[in-house]
Amino acid sequence: MKRTAEIDRSTSETRIHLKLTIDGTGLSAIRTTVPFLDHMLHLFARHGLFDLTVEAQGDIDIDFHHTVEDIGIVLGEAFRQALGDKKGIVRYGTARIPMDETLADVTVDLSGRPYLVYNVDLPKVKVGEFDAELAREFFQAFANNCGCNLHLNLLYGENVHHIIEACFKGFGRSLDSATRQDARLHGVMSTKGVL
């Protein structure tokens, strides 16, 4: 059974079409009108080996906030839908990613309980036109709508682009690990019998 989801979401602030294949090869087609986010989502898909299509339009004449947050919402919903009852998945994933002077650790638990820990102090507030604080908004929206614990910890780093990039690569790799299916599992990875 293919683990896929396709979602269309329209609000007064954004219009988003997203298609996800969990068991992909890292192919992506991303057009969000936020170039730095496009770059991060390409990296996420490639390093997580997810096939991902995102087309988004938003009120970027105001700022990027609504577009970035709403894409996090839709991506989280897509993972939740594609994983279904989560039978057979490993559930946990972690990745420690270097990017030159930066080292970031990302851990996920597909528990059904949304929670974000974001220990990422950024040395400046912008990467080009992108407000660096929006990375946190994206991850919070994802965790809330996927229903997962998501922990991002920056061990060290100086370049804000490298820091956010290491976080997105680690996000992809940790989700790849957590969504893997293990033939030894019957049901879900929980003594409760449900995730």
Curated annotation (Swiss-Prot):
Q: Which UniProt keywords apply?
A: Amino-acid biosynthesis, Cytoplasm, Histidine biosynthesis, Lyase
Pfam families given for it?
IGPD
Q: Where in the cell is it found?
A: Cytoplasm
Q: Which GO terms describe its cellular component?
A: cytoplasm
Pathway the protein takes part in: Amino-acid biosynthesis; L-histidine biosynthesis; L-histidine from 5-phospho-alpha-D-ribose 1-diphosphate: step 6/9
Q: What InterPro entries would the database entry show?
A: IGPD_sf, ImidazoleglycerolP_deHydtase, ImidazoleglycerP_deHydtase_CS, Ribosomal_Su5_D2-typ_SF
Catalytic activity as recorded in UniProt:
D-erythro-1-(imidazol-4-yl)glycerol 3-phosphate = 3-(imidazol-4-yl)-2-oxopropyl phosphate + H2O
Q: What is its EC number?
A: 4.2.1.19
Q: Does the keyword Lyase apply?
A: yes
Record's superkingdom?
Bacteria
Keyword Glycoprotein annotated: no
Does the entry annotate any disulfide bonds, and if so which pairs? Answer: none
Q: Which GO terms describe its molecular function?
A: imidazoleglycerol-phosphate dehydratase activity
Q: Tell me which Gene Ontology terms the entry assigns under biological process.
A: L-histidine biosynthetic process
Primary location: cytoplasm
Q: Which HAMAP family match?
A: HisB (MF_00076)
Q: Which PANTHER family match?
A: IMIDAZOLEGLYCEROL-PHOSPHATE DEHYDRATASE, IMIDAZOLEGLYCEROL-PHOSPHATE DEHYDRATASE HIS7
State the similarity comment.
Answer: Belongs to the imidazoleglycerol-phosphate dehydratase family.
What protein am I looking at? Answer: Imidazoleglycerol-phosphate dehydratase
Q: Which organism is it from?
A: Trichlorobacter lovleyi (strain ATCC BAA-1151 / DSM 17278 / SZ) (Geobacter lovleyi)
